[in-house]
């Protein structure tokens, strides 16, 4: 089966998950050091490849990003650069387990849930006791657990609109972060990423049809319905 082209639409954020072929901690001594280095590469590559970063989490088995690319190739180039740098540092072959998966995220509806999904990944999937304090994630900047700001973090308008001051925004986000996502939200995000279809309402998906790089939602399975002959004749007579 031919693989799907990347789904892209101008100005629309993308949720990205790139899985490593092998956990980094088993490929190099000092798992934290390689994550420090990977995070630096990520930060350095954003401006070079024209990517606005809204949220991120790095783990020993993958990269999770919420970002708005400047063009159709920006995110692909960024991920490829990270893969090349890792392969060189680890003196290995390919580092990713296949292609990264991505989905377009509807602003105003799914951006905050997507942020919570990726920033709570280490708690949900790794059993980390406090994912807010994960050093290789934007979670602490959004909840206020980290002091100061991150120069490369470009907060999405949905985050900015949640409060008038940084404290208000952090408090509002921390509340939703602590509350977590429903099982339905988790399932919708997982399905959109797995299928690489858009994550959003029917109205959002309808709008994407005229601007996206390819069809944003899965078509109906099976052959198109063939109308009975008597209906076809009726149509011609009308």
Regions found by a protein language model. Give the residues of each.
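Short Pro-Cys-Gly-centered "Cys-loop" motif that presents a nucleophilic cysteine in a tight turn
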Residues: 1-61, 68-238
């Amino acid at each position: 089966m031919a693989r799907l082209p990347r789904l892209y639409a101008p100005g629309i954020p993308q949720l990205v998950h790139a899985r490593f072929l092998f956990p980094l901690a088993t490929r190099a001594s000092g798992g934290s050091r390689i994550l420090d280095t990977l995070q630096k590469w990520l930060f350095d590559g954003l401006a070079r490849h024209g990517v606005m970063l809204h949220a991120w989490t790095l783990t020993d088995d993958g990269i999770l990003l919420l970002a708005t690319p400047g063009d159709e190739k920006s995110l692909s180039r960024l991920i490829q650069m990270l893969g090349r740098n890792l392969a060189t540092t680890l003196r290995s072959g390919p580092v990713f387990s296949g292609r990264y998966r991505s989905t377009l995220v509807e602003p105003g509806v799914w951006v905050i849930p997507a942020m919570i999904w990726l920033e709570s990944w280490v708690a949900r999937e790794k059993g980390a006791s406090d994912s807010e304090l994960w050093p290789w994630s934007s979670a602490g900047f959004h909840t206020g657990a980290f002091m100061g700001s991150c120069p490369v973090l470009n907060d999405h308008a949905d985050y900015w609109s949640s409060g008038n001051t940084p404290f208000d925004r952090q408090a509002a986000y921390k509340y939703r972060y602590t509350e977590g996502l429903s099982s339905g939200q988790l399932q919708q995000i997982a399905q959109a990423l797995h299928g690489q279809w858009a994550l959003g309402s029917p109205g959002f998906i309808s709008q994407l049809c005229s601007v996206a790089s390819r069809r944003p939602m899965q078509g109906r399975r099976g052959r198109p319905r063939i109308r009975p002959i008597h209906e076809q004749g009726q149509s011609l007579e009308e």
